[in-house]
Structure formats: structure tokens, C-alpha cells
Amino acid sequence: MQATKPAITGAQIRAARAFLHWSVQDLAERCGVSESAISRAEKMDGVPSMQGRNLNAVRTAFEIHGIEFLDSTGLRIRPR
């Protein structure tokens, strides 16, 4: 059984996007979530009130590009 990953926060979404030098549009294209939904999520304190599948799509887009989320505190590049 796979462990559930903790939800990511708006601050982590902003930080991961900045780390990868992605615009909101870049992230939206990579994860299939609207730019407006991403912008709203980034402005929220804590876990965004975004549909679970959208939040998972955002997380997956970052993880594919090497981002590893650390609980609700930060992120890093996944070691190879």
C-alpha cells in the first residue's frame, strides 16, 4: 500500500515554480490546471482549497521535474 503524500501549500507551489523558472502559464500547461486556479492556490496560506485531483496534478508536474516536497515546510531537488 502506498503512503499518502502530505498536501502541498500555496507557498510551496510558488517556491517550486520560481525554482524551475516557470510562469503560471508554464505550470498550467504542464499540469492541465487553469492559470486562475493556480494563481488562487498560490495566494492561499496553507493547503489550497483546490480539488484534490488538481493539487495532485500540480504536485506531479513538479515531481517529474525533480522537485521533492518536504512536509509543509519547503522543497528541494530530488537527489539522483
What are these regions (language model features)?
Residues S23-R40:
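Short alpha-helical DNA-recognition segment
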Residues I67-R80:
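Helix-turn-helix/homeodomain-like alpha-helical modules used for DNA recognition
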